[in-house]
C-alpha cells in the first residue's frame, strides 16, 4: 500500500487472509480503530453535554421548569437516535475516512451554539417561551453526537476479520460510551473556573456555561484532523441493502431490538437524566454535601463510567455462558435494583438510591454486550435451519445470514437508542404534577418547600421501569431459553449462545 493511498481509498483488503492480516492489515486496522474511538468518544461527550447544562441553567439566570428541563435532555437523545439510521449507510456512501471527518466536524455546531447563544445577553432579554425554544434548538444539535456510534461501528466492522470483530467492536463501543462519564465529570468543574470557592459552596452561584461549549472545540478540530490524516476508506465497504430488507422482515430482529431498548436504552437514558433526577429528588442531601452537588454533578458520571466498563464484561460472560442467559439475569437484576431504588426514594436515602442505580448501570452495560452477542448466534442458527431444510446452500446460507446479522446489529443499535428517549419521556410525565405545584407557589421559599415535599415524584416512573424489565426478562426466556415438559428445548426459539 503506497503512502498516497493512506489518504484515499484502499482497494485490496483481505483481513481473513492470515498473511495479509499479519503483514499489514493488523497495523492499518489498529490505527483506524484508535482514531475511530477518539472521534466517537467526542461524539458521545457532546451528545450528553446538556445533561450538565440543564442543571446549571438556574445559576446562569435562566429558569426552566422540571418538565422543560427533561425536554432539553430528551431531544438530543431523540435526534441522535434518528441519525443512527442514515449514519449507518454513510460509511459505504462516503468512505470511512471522509465520513468520520464530516461527522466529527458537525460537532462544532452544538459547541458554538452553547458557547455563543446560550450565555448571550440577547437570550437573557427574551421571554420565557422564546428562551425555551431557543434552548431546545441548541440542545437538538447535540444529537449529532449520537449518530456517530452507528457509522463508527459500521466502519470498524469492515476492517477486522470475523475472529477479531468482537473485541474491536467492544473496544470501539466502550471507548465511545466513556465520553458520557468524561462529560459528566469534567464539565461541572470547567463551568465554575474563576468562581470563588466560597461562592461555589452556595446553592446558587455563578457559572460560565460558555466554557462547556468552548472546552470541546479543540478536541472536535483534533478529531476531524486525525480522521482526515490517519484514517482510511475501503472500496469493499459496501452496504448490503438486501440484507437490511431481509433483516427488517425477520421477527428476530425486532425481538432483539426490543431487548436492546431495555439494555442500551437504560444505559443512555439514565445517563441523560440521572444528574437531573438526583438534583430534584435529594435536595437536602445535596445541600449538605455541596462538593458532590457542584463539583461532581451528584456523582451522576459514575453510572456512565460503570456501564461503559461493564459492556465488554457482558460480552465475555456471553462467550462462556451464552448471550440469552446473561441477558435474562441482567434484566432480572435490573428489575430488582429498580425496586431498591424506589425504596431509596421513599426513604429519602441517597446512598440506597445511588447504590441501586450503580448496580442498574452495571447490569445495563453487561446487557449491552450480551444482547449484541446474541445477534450473530441467532442468525447463524436461522441460516443452519434454512440450509438443513434444503432452502439454501449451506455455504451461501453462512454468507447471507452473516450479512443479515450485521444489518440487524445496525438496526438494533438505532432502535435501542430510542429507549433512552422513552425513559426520559416517562420521567417527564411523572414530573408534571410537582412541576404544576411548584409553578403555583408564589415565593422562592414556597417553591422549594413544595419541591422537597414531593421529592418522590419519580416513583411512578420507576415502577413502570420495574415492570418493563420483568417483561423483557420473560421475552428473553420465552424466545430463547424455554423448554417443554420433557426438558427438551422448544423448536421455535433460537438459542442465542
Which residue stretches match the model-derived regions?
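Helix-loop-helix hairpin linking two adjacent transmembrane segments in secondary transporters
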Residues: 172-228
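Extracytoplasmic gate region of multi-pass secondary transporters
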Residues: 50-55, 250-308, 368, 372, ...
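Central cavity-lining transmembrane alpha-helices of secondary-active solute carriers
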Residues: 71-89, 301-314
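C-terminal transmembrane helical hairpin of 12-TM major facilitator-type secondary transporters
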Residues: 321-371
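C-terminal ends and interior cores of transmembrane alpha-helices
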Residues: 105-128, 332-348
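Pair of pore-lining "gating" transmembrane helices in MFS-fold secondary transporters
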Residues: 25-53, 253-269, 358, 362
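C-terminal membrane-cytosol helix-exit motif in multi-pass small-molecule transporters
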Residues: 216-237, 473-480
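Glycine-rich segments within core transmembrane alpha-helices of 12-TM secondary carriers
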Residues: 146, 166-192, 409-423
